[in-house]
């Protein structure tokens, strides 16, 4: 029983200082609450700023995509302007000779070919004997020929690729099976 009395005295002595410290703890809790409320406000402000920044980034990205679509052919158009200039100059010549016309057309064709190359517009020029590739060639007719079946006999019209994407297939005549 002495042990119980001893424990009761210790518990009572512990409670007394605790109640004496209670007024000191309350301001600390109030300070913690105020600090927590301030932190919540700062986090809300930070969240709103991040959200606004994200929305601005998304808007700018969408504007960039819109601009890219709008001006996607600008480089190609810039490359074609000299070709048009050359054709207009050729039409202004009063009495052109056949030789000067041919020379002008050849120069204009070089300009056009350079514009195509600059913009990754490639020609599909199948040669006689090449295997028919349905991804790049369109067989217009099948003719008897002294070569392997399904090989190209002649090219009627060149095809074109834009950056590995088919723009127009080459029109070809193909050898028939024997």
UniProtKB/Swiss-Prot annotation:
Top-level lineage group: Bacteria
MF GO annotations: adenyl-nucleotide exchange factor activity; protein homodimerization activity; protein-folding chaperone binding; unfolded protein binding
InterPro entries in UniProt: GrpE (IPR000740), GrpE_coiled_coil (IPR013805), GrpE_head (IPR009012)
Job of this protein: Participates actively in the response to hyperosmotic and heat shock by preventing the aggregation of stress-denatured proteins, in association with DnaK and GrpE. It is the nucleotide exchange factor for DnaK and may function as a thermosensor. Unfolded proteins bind initially to DnaJ; upon interaction with the DnaJ-bound protein, DnaK hydrolyzes its bound ATP, resulting in the formation of a stable complex. GrpE releases ADP from DnaK; ATP binding to DnaK triggers the release of the substrate protein, thus completing the reaction cycle.
Cell compartment(s), UniProt: Cytoplasm
GO cellular component labels: cytosol
Region (Disordered): 1-26
A Gene Ontology biological process term: protein folding
Name used for this protein in its record: Protein GrpE
Complex formation: Homodimer.
The entry's keywords: Chaperone, Cytoplasm, Stress response
Family: Belongs to the GrpE family.
Organism: Herminiimonas arsenicoxydans
CDD domains (alphabetical): GrpE
Main location: cytoplasm
